[in-house]
Amino acid sequence: MAVVVAPEDVDRFLTLADSENLQAVPVAVVKAEPRLVMNWNGKAIVDISREFLNSNGAEKHITAAPEKPQPYGRQVNGGFAENYTALADDLNICSKRGLAEQFDSTIGAGTVLMPFGGRNQLTPIQAMVQKISVEKRHTDDCSLMAWGYNPFISEKSPYHGAYLAVIESVSKLIATGAEFSDVYLTFQEYFERLGKDEKRWGKPLAALLGAFKAQTDLGIAAIGGKDSMSGTFEKLDVPPTLVSFAVTTDKVKNVTANEFKKAGDKVVLIAPEYNKNDLPDTASLLAVYGKVTSLLRSGKALACYTPTYGGIAEAVMKMCFGNSLGFKFSDGISLDTIFGYRYGGFLLEVTEGIEGAVEIGKITNDGKISDRGEEISLGRLLGAYEDKLESVFRCNISSTQPDPENFSYIAQDRAAPAVRSAKPRVLIPVFPGTNCEYDSAKAMRDAGAEPEIFVINNRSADKVAESVERFAESMKKAQIVFIPGGFSGGDEPDGSGKFITAFFRNAAVKAEVADLLDNRGGLMCGICNGFQALIKLGLVPYGRIIDTDESCPTLTYNTIARHQSKIVRTRIASNKSPWLAETEVGDIYSVPISHGEGRFIASDELIRQLAANGQIATQYVDLDGNASSDIRFNPNGSFCAIEGITSPDGRVFGKMGHSERYACGLYKNVPGDYNIKMFESAVKYFK
């Protein structure tokens, strides 16, 4: 990253960068002379005038000849079940969950909608929604972003494809609860190599005209964007590509989840009129946008989805998946209506009919999607939908472990601190690769503690030694040490967290850890990467730093052999730990997870000992509250579904789930109780 600073601020900037463990080097000076000069080894290798740079190169001219648009409507052949199965199996529609779960969707503790919603986490969202990031305060403002593009339409008519890409992206925002008034756009374009062919040049021209027409019709502008004209390899050309991204801001309370909520509700279609060019009439479309927003904000509509590539059929199927609900289409709804394009239209779940809307069917609880006597099971559709990319992006592996028992240990008494504190100090070390320090500090601050984020500098041996000395001094003043999550050293080979453990094994730091736990009655916690460090140090389950061996428990690679990011349900198996003092055994809490190495492994004998001593704190459970080995509920294949364990006295707590990522208004499309109150419990421990 290049940063321009005033000359008098350079030294201060370098100092600040060093404090963040970043290398900063002055590389250039801004001068009054209008020339760009670059030197290498004392020799000027570039010396260009500013006037030349401003010219943008030599002027060029080309003739562009857009071709006549071809019909692009979806052709529906065959029966209802046949078309639905083919739809679920289509690469453009099938599940991408195995890919999406490889990316951390909850970092920053601001995710309003998870990528997949419903209790099954299977209904994909149509817009990304995140709270605006604020470090030390809270907000109910959020940003929304959605995209639109159909390559099959753009191939037939780049003009229509670009126009409808804009409509699709904006409609997805409206379906998610946003208001149209403050929507803006940005575009990404990608076309074949153009050369001097007039027809080839006609494709980007037609697409840009379509996008421009959509902007003028809607009265909204595109800001920025990126384009490329290199989409040709030998005789292969990419289809004309203009992807529209729509973005806006709104309040969290207005955000609507997409999945169907309950059986018996009606589903209606509200759609705009289309003009002679087979595009939505602008006045009609804007009226539809206003009506949909009004229905969502009044609570009359419980869920909403705008049909895209797969039409109404795709929307209904995906809305059903989230909560395992079925659907029965109304008589008189043709297959062309069900499977055809419906850009700018909206499906809404309502309890009563809506004036001007077409009732297309009702939600059922029979696990089927049916139309006039022909039906197909939701399970069959889900199988086709998820199996298509299973060999590439795995998500449904089977477990060889039997379902474990639910452990239960009710604490009779708990450890107490040697010194009370109304506002305990929390030391949060930040190692290379740590990425949860802000979320952790905020959770601690909200609970009433005083967090200190301490960046470990490893840019040289001297910097590491200095960090060790300063960290040991900071530990003397702290009551809690909290090791946050992340990917220490990029999740180093042969196990993550090795640098963290090496740091804590330093004699000075090790001595302060012993003093904190043995003499001052302090607390420690590690989440995700921090839990991995606690395990490797022996702090869990043994309560002290030891030389671990093969008999010790460990955390290893997820059985699915990839990163997992989703919401899981965890059951309190023991409330012995001061961190869990506000919970009851049997309570179930939902929590985000994001890790590639979270599989807890230990011998049967050790697990029995931990259970008997109340050191198994939390377990992964299914929708019925039972400990499970099923990959849907136990994301890493942990033995006995163990998610978190403690030291013998409970004062050191390690867990995989990111409980620090809880805040009001998050994860609205995945039901559950997310407030485990572990940070409040830790603060109360010292009072």
Predicted feature residues:
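Short glycine-/acidic-enriched loop or helix-start segments at secondary-structure transitions
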Residues: 438, 492-494, 534-537, 603, ...
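Amide-donor transfer/coupling interface in amidating biosynthetic enzymes
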Residues: 466, 470-473, 514-515, 547-687
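Cysteine-nucleophile active-site neighborhood
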Residues: 484, 488-576
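Catalytic metal-binding/acid-base residues of hydrolase active sites
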Residues: 228, 488, 530-532, 597, ...
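Glycine/proline-enriched, intrinsically flexible loops and inter-domain linkers
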Residues: 1-490, 503-514, 640, 646, ...
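Short, well-ordered, mixed-charge alpha-helical segments that flank or form enzyme active sites
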Residues: 34-36, 230-232, 253, 532-536, ...
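Short, basic, glycine/proline-bearing loop/turn elements
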Residues: 196, 276, 493-501, 619, ...
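Active-site glycine-centered loops adjacent to acidic/histidine catalytic or metal-binding residues
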Residues: 306, 528, 658
